[in-house]
């Protein structure tokens, strides 16, 4: 497996720009071989491969996958010396190619500030432990796969906002059902995805061609609403919220947040279908966040 994955990391190194990030979601594995049960550290093997290519490994994230499974025991149950710890987390490995990204032009600096995130989001997103409910999807229309272990939308949404800025191109070498592509659309980024399972193409086309725009835009509003609740809570505690963001008409904690803007998705169109799927996203520019009609409001992160 890792010999094949090494080819992917090599291509990522080739195409990524200086200062760009590589984020890899991987779980460790347990196997019984020749009667011996053991842990196989996939994360360690991938770190070694990426560092050999020249990537710098930055602080990683542990994704603690909350579960309602009634039986999580491995091994001898209640008896000592034969039971094993159940793996309930996966790794999100963070790498950077080369030195920090530079911002020399005024337009580059403006885009970076426009792509900022809220102070309270940073406190959660840049923690090294994430608790996000996992996703398990059964695919009836893809004969080549009995199950697709998609990660939840919130995971790539966070990473894209943390390690890229608006207008950037996000590369997904394991496209699957397009979760990363959807997260990129919601974050006003472009994306390119590759998937070797050709039988997934019709389903992927259906998913990305029929995005529920109202539901997708509800994520943007929900993010804004969570911030308003955060501000209200601080005010009730007589804590200071010092700055104003005139673009989205709310108080913010730091000066770096004052240029943050949101734009709603207008439509997502399939523009090319010869040997690839090409989608174009349009946004409602200049529309204020709090002008959103009440019937469009909701939540996408459940």
Residue locations for each model-derived region?
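S-adenosyl-L-methionine-dependent nucleic acid methyltransferase catalytic domains
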Residues: 1-74, 83, 117-302
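Short, surface-exposed loop/helix-turn segments at secondary-structure junctions
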Residues: 74-77, 110
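Eukaryotic intrinsically disordered and solvent-exposed regulatory patches
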Residues: 80
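Conserved beta strand-loop-helix elements of the APE1-like EEP
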Residues: 83-101
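Short, acidic Gly/Pro/Ser/Thr-rich loop/turn segments
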Residues: 100-102, 137-138
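Proline-centered turn/helix-capping motifs that create local helix->coil transitions or kinks
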Residues: 101-106, 122-125
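Active-site-adjacent helix-turn-beta-strand microarchitecture at beta-sheet edges
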Residues: 108-119
């Amino acid at each position: 497996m890792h010999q094949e994955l090494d080819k992917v990391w090599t291509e990522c190194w080739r195409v990524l720009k200086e200062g760009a990030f590589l984020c890899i979601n991987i779980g460790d594995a347990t196997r019984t071989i020749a009667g011996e049960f053991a842990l196989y550290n996939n994360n360690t093997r991938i770190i070694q491969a990426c560092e050999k290519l020249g990537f710098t490994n930055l602080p990683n994230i542990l994704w603690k996958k909350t579960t309602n499974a009634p039986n999580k025991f491995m091994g001898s149950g209640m008896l000592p010396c034969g039971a094993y710890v159940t793996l309930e987390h996966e790794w999100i490995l963070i790498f950077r190619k080369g030195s920090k990204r530079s911002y020399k032009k005024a337009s580059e600096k403006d885009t970076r500030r426009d792509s900022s995130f809220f102070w309270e989001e940073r406190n959660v997103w840049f923690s090294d432990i994430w608790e996000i409910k996992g996703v398990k999807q059964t695919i009836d229309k893809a004969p080549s796969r009995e199950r697709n272990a998609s990660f939840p939308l919130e995971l790539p949404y966070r990473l894209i906002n943390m390690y890229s800025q608006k207008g950037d191109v996000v590369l997904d070498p394991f496209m699957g059902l397009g979760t990363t592509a959807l997260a990129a659309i919601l974050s006003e980024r472009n994306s390119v995805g590759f998937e070797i399972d050709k039988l997934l193409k019709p389903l992927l086309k259906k998913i990305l061609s029929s995005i529920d725009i109202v539901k997708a835009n509800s994520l943007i509003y929900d993010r804004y609403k969570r911030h308003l609740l955060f501000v209200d809570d601080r005010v009730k505690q007589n804590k200071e919220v010092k700055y104003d963001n005139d673009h989205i008409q709310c108080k913010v904690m730091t000066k770096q947040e004052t240029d943050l803007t949101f734009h709603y998705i207008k439509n997502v169109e399939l523009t090319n279908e010869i040997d690839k799927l090409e989608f174009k996203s349009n946004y409602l520019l200049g529309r204020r966040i709090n002008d959103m009609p009440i019937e469009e409001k909701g939540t996408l992160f459940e």
